[in-house]
C-alpha cells in the first residue's frame, strides 16, 4: 500500500460501478510506482469526482522465466470472436483427465496470463492427487488487458472461444468455473465442448462448487484448531478472513454461526454491509494479516504470503481457500521458523474439485460427497503429523502425499 491519493473526473477514466464503490483504471501520474497498481475509488463526491486509495501489489506476478516447465502441453491461442489471448495448460494427465477451472482476469501482459496458467495447473496436479481423485491437473486463463470491462456479448464470445480451445485438445482437459467466471458462463462454454463441468442445475449441471470448497476449508480449520489447542471447537476463537467472495463469504457465515469472533476484509468495500450483518469487525485489506488472532484465513487471490506478510503475521496459523498462497516456495520454511502452522492451500481448498468430480458421476450421492469433503480435515491432520515426525515443513509433507499417488501410477 502506498500513500497516494488523487482526484479524477470520471469522464477521464474507465469505470465499472459497484454497489458502494467504483473500480477505476486510470493513467498513473508521474512519480507514482512504475508497476500498475489496483485502484479502489470510494466516497463518491458531487460533480463526478471521486477520491481514490491506490493499492500497490506487494509482489509482481509470476513470470514465464520463473515458472518451472514440467507440463505435458500448453495451448496458447487468440480467440476468433473475442480477440483475447487464451492459455490452456495441461500439467499432468497421469492420474486421468486433467481438471481445473477457467480464470478470466486482468494482467499487464498476455505472458503473465500464460505464466499464471502454468503455475495454477501445476498446483491442480498436486490438489487432485492429494485429494485422492483420478484426475490430472490443468488450468485455463483468459487474458484481459488492464482496465478492460467486457459487455455481456463480449463475455459470451470469450466463453465460446474458450470452448473451442478446450475442444481442440481432444478431451485431455476438463474445465469449470474459477475467478472471473461462473456456472452460467460455463453453460456457454458447453455450447462448444463437452469437456466442462459445474454448469447451473437448471442447465443439467451440478451447480457451483463454492459450498463444498467452504466445507473443506471449515474441516481444515477444525483440524488446525485441534493441532493448536487440542479442541476443534471454533466458538470463541478469533479468525481474520481476507476475502469475502463466494467461498470466503460462505465460510464467514459458517464460522459466525458457530460462535467465532470474526475480523474481515475485502477489496470490495460494499462487503462492509455483510460484515455488519455477521457482527464482524472490519479492517483494511493491507492491515488484516497483522491483526492478533488465532487463525488468518486468506480467501482472495494468491501470493498473499510474501516475506513481509509472513514477518508481520499476527496469527498462530494460516488456513484459507486462496490458491497459491505462498509468494515463494521458501515461505513454508519462513512460516515454520516463526512457529506459524500453515495448512497447505492445495489440500485445504480441494472441496470444490472433489464435488465437481463426484457430483458429475451418474451415481452421485450428496451424502457420500459431503463425507468425502469432510475427510479433507483428516488429510490436514496427517500432514501436520508427518511434518512434525519427519522434521519437514507442512508444504513438503503435502507434496510427499501428492507425489506418492503420482509415483504409484508410473
What are these regions (language model features)?
Residues 128-133, 170-178, 229-238, 387-399:
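Flexible, glycine/charged-enriched surface loops at secondary-structure junctions
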Residues 236, 267-348:
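Rossmann-like adenosine-cofactor binding region
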Residues 225, 316-410:
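Adenosine-phosphate binding glycine-rich loop
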Residues 5-31, 36-45, 49-51:
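Short, intrinsically disordered or compositionally biased N-terminal tails of bacterial proteins
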Residues 208-293:
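Glycine-rich phosphate/diphosphate-binding loop of Rossmann-like nucleotide-binding domains
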Residues 114-121, 156-163, 167, 186-190, ...:
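Predominant activation on well-ordered alpha-helical scaffold segments within soluble catalytic domains
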Residues 40, 48-203:
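N-terminal ligand-binding/catalytic initiation module
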Amino acid at each position: 500500500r502506498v500513500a497516494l491519493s488523487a482526484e479524477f473526473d470520471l469522464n477521464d477514466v474507465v469505470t465499472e460501478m459497484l454497489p458502494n464503490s467504483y473500480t477505476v483504471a486510470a493513467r498513473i501520474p508521474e512519480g507514482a510506482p512504475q508497476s500498475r497498481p489496483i485502484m479502489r475509488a470510494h466516497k463518491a463526491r458531487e460533480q463526478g469526482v471521486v477520491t481514490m486509495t491506490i493499492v500497490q501489489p506487494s509482489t509482481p506476478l509470476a513470470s514465464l522465466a520463473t515458472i518451472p516447465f514440467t507440463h505435458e502441453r500448453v495451448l496458447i491461442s487468440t480467440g476468433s470472436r473475442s480477440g483475447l489471448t487464451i492459455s490452456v495448460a495441461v500439467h499432468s494427465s497421469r492420474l486421468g483427465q486433467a481438471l481445473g477451472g477457467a480464470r478470466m482476469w486482468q494482467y499487464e501482459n498476455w505472458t503473465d496470463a500464460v505464466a499464471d496458467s502454468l503455475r495454477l495447473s501445476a498446483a491442480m496436479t498436486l490438489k487432485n492427487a492429494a485429494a485422492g481423485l483420478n484426475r490430472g491437473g490443468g488450468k485455463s486463463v483468459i487474458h484481459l488487458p488492464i482496465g478492460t470491462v467486457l459487455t455481456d456479448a463480449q463475455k459470451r464470445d470469450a466463453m465460446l472461444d474458450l470452448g473451442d480451445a478446450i475442444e481442440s485438445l481432444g478431451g485431455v482437459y476438463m474445465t469449470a468455473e474459477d475467478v472471473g467466471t461462473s456456472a452460467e458462463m460455463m453453460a456457454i462454454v458447453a455450447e462448444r465442448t463437452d469437456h466442462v463441468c459445474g454448469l447451473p442445475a437448471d442447465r443439467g449441471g451440478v451447480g457451483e462448487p463454492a459450498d463444498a470448497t467452504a466445507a473443506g476449508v471449515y474441516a481444515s480449520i477444525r483440524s488446525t484448531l485441534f493441532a493448536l489447542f487440542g479442541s476443534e471447537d471454533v466458538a470463541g476463537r478469533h479468525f481474520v478472513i481476507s476475502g469475502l467472495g463466494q467461498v470466503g463469504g460462505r465460510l464467514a457465515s459458517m464460522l459466525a454461526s458457530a460462535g467465532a469472533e470474526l475480523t474481515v476484509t475485502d477489496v470490495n468495500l460494499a462487503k462492509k454491509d455483510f460484515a455488519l450483518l455477521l457482527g464482524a469487525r472490519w479492517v483494511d485489506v493491507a492491515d488484516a494479516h497483522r491483526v492478533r488472532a488465532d487463525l488468518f484465513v486468506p480467501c482472495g487471490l494468491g501470493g498473499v504470503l510474501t516475506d513481509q506478510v509472513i514477518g508481520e503475521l499476527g496469527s498462530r496459523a494460516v488456513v484459507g481457500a486462496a490458491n497459491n498462497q505462498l509468494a515463494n516456495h521458501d515461505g513454508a520454511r519462513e512460516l515454520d521458523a516463526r512457529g506459524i502452522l500453515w495448512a497447505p492451500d492445495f489440500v485445504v481448498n480441494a472441496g470444490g474439485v472433489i464435488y465437481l468430480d463426484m457430483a458429475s458421476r451418474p451415481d452421485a450421492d450428496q451424502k457420500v460427497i459431503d463425507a468425502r469433503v469432510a475427510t479433507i480435515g483428516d488429510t490436514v491432520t496427517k500432514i501436520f503429523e508427518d511434518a512434525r515426525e519427519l522434521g519437514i515443513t507442512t508444504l513438503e509433507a503435502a507434496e510427499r502425499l501428492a507425489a506418492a499417488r503420482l509415483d504409484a501410477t508410473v
